[in-house]
From Swiss-Prot:
This is Large ribosomal subunit protein bL28. GO terms for cellular component: cytosolic large ribosomal subunit. It comes from Paraburkholderia xenovorans (strain LB400). One of its GO terms (biological process) is translation. GO terms for molecular function: structural constituent of ribosome.
Length: 77
């Protein structure tokens, strides 16, 4: 399973660890993904999402129905 948020599309980024001596080594910045079951009142069922913390905030802000409609329009749910 890819480390990608189903709501926002956030995926791992690459960057550098930088030591005190300014030595650089490659690293990955992973999104803060959570597996969540969210109750959808209109469908009277639970929906499982692999969602980032930013995605959870979007669900709180816009509502699960609007977020699911957007996912279905993109063909992802």
């Amino acid at each position: 399973m890819a480390r990608v948020c189903q709501v926002t599309g956030k995926a791992p980024m690459s960057g550098n660890n930088v030591s005190h001596a300014n030595n650089k080594t490659k690293r990955r910045f992973l999104p803060n993904l959570q597996n969540r079951r969210i109750w959808v009142e209109s469908e009277n069922r639970w929906v499982r999402l692999r969602v980032s913390n930013a995605g959870l905030r979007l669900i709180d802000k816009n509502g699960i129905d609007a977020v699911l409609a957007d996912l279905r329009a993109r063909g992802e749910a």
